[in-house]
């Protein structure tokens, strides 16, 4: 059963950016999340939270994504560790807890130099910049928005650039 899930998760990660709704459908085929290994459960909640975020579902609680941050924080999986903290930040941002969101976003940056996913970095910097904007800390806001812009430029992602410039 374990290898079956790792294949499913890999597929889910591949199609996430284009088809997050399909990821939700895929994840719904897993019968009992409590029967999963610790790693598989962490992956499940990370993918679930990411797919819900990308399909604009409102987050109600950070207890599930917390399982992912607790697991990945103990690993060397830089990308998933960063993603778990980012999505935990997104969740508490939804819950209107800006200080905690900021804390989690900055935790997502702890291995910044090792992250090569520029689309992810662009979104992360943008989220940090937006929070600083709301707090009227404009110098830091501009710093992170510029970093966001640079990430999307590296991607040649015109959609991403227009998203930051609005």
Labelled PLM ranges:
Residues 2-166:
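A "functional boundary" signal
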């Amino acid at each position: 059963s374990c290898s079956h899930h790792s294949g499913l998760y890999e597929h889910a990660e591949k199609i996430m950016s284009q088809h997050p709704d399909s990821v939700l459908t895929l994840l719904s085929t897993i019968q009992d999340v409590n029967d999963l290994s610790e790693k598989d459960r962490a992956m499940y909640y990370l993918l679930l939270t990411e797919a819900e975020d990308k399909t604009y579902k409102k987050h109600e609680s950070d207890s599930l994504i917390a399982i992912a941050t607790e697991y990945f924080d103990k690993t060397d999986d830089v990308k998933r560790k960063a993603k778990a903290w980012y999505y935990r930040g997104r969740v508490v941002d939804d819950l209107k807890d800006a200080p905690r969101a900021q804390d989690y976003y900055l935790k997502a940056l702890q291995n910044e130099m090792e992250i090569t996913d520029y689309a992810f970095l662009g979104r992360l910097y943008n989220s940090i910049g937006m929070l600083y904007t709301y707090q009227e800390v404009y110098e830091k806001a501009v710093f992170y928005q510029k970093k966001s812009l640079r990430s999307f430029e590296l991607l040649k992602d015109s959609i991403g650039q227009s998203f930051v410039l609005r």
